[in-house]
């Protein structure tokens, strides 16, 4: 599953906490569009399951942080090797509204920075795995944030969830299409020297 992503997610570890531990931040989209059920049982549930599998299979010398984002981005848990605690916060994630991918990247960079030994080399110290379905609707531009990550030597690997047939019902009862913006996520990965994937089905995700 996500260990395919992890295979190229391992950063250089100069200066990170505990010397030999890699730092990976899972940035998980919890916007309303992630509640679409074109990927069964829903985009967000498939993304959460992918994150949980990643956590379970990650090597023990990995510090994992979690950032969740809708119209705001926030660190849900600082980078840690406590897999049970990480799994609890991922399981509890629920969808909101809005999509602030740029803000999520900045929050993930802050999470990496906080896990790095200040006496060491902070360059190339972490990797971000961005699980989302698409387009930034609020906050700072995602390409600007990706460029900041690139300048710090932090790779961003992206996974786009959903199909062109995805829809959601808004709070006022309107059914609106929510196709994934695969190109936007690919652009982020390109700028930050990562790789991008698309998961139109849960089976697709297992092939990553």
Annotate each PLM feature.
Residues 1-56:
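An amphipathic, basic-hydrophobic helix/alpha-beta surface used to engage anionic
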Residues 18, 40, 63-92, 106-119, ...:
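Short beta-strand-loop
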Residues 20, 40, 44-48, 57, ...:
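Solvent-exposed, acidic/flexible segments
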Residues 23-33, 45, 50, 63-69, ...:
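Soluble periplasmic/extracytoplasmic beta-strand elements of cell-envelope proteins
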Residues 32, 52-63, 91-95, 109-117, ...:
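Sec-exported extracytoplasmic/periplasmic mature domains
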Residues 32-33, 71-74, 83, 95-97, ...:
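Solvent-exposed loop/turn segments at secondary-structure junctions
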Residues 99, 103-106, 118-127, 132-191:
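VWA/integrin I-like adhesion module and closely mimicked acidic/polar interface patches used
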Residues 181-208:
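Extended, hydrophilic extramembrane loops/domains of integral membrane proteins
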């Amino acid at each position: 599953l996500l260990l395919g992503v992890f295979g190229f997610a391992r950063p250089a570890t100069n200066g990170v906490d505990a010397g030999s531990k890699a730092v990976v931040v899972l940035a998980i989209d919890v916007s309303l569009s992630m509640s679409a059920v074109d990927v069964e049982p829903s985009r967000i549930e498939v993304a959460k399951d992918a994150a949980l599998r990643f956590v379970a299979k990650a090597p023990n010398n990995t510090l994992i942080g979690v950032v969740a984002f809708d119209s705001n981005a926030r660190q849900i848990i600082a980078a840690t090797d406590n897999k049970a605690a990480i799994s609890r916060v991922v399981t509890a994630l629920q969808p909101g509204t809005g999509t602030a991918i740029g803000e999520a990247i900045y929050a993930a960079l802050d999470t990496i920075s906080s896990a790095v030994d200040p006496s060491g080399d902070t360059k190339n110290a972490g990797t971000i795995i961005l699980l989302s379905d698409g387009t930034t609707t609020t906050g700072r531009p995602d390409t600007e944030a990706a460029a900041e990550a690139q300048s710090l030597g932090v790779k961003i690997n992206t996974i786009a969830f959903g199909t062109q047939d995805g829809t959601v019902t808004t709070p006022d009862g309107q059914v609106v299409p929510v196709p994934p913006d695969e190109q936007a996520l690919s652009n982020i990965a390109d700028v930050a020297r990562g790789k991008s994937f698309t998961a139109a089905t849960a089976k697709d995700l297992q092939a990553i």
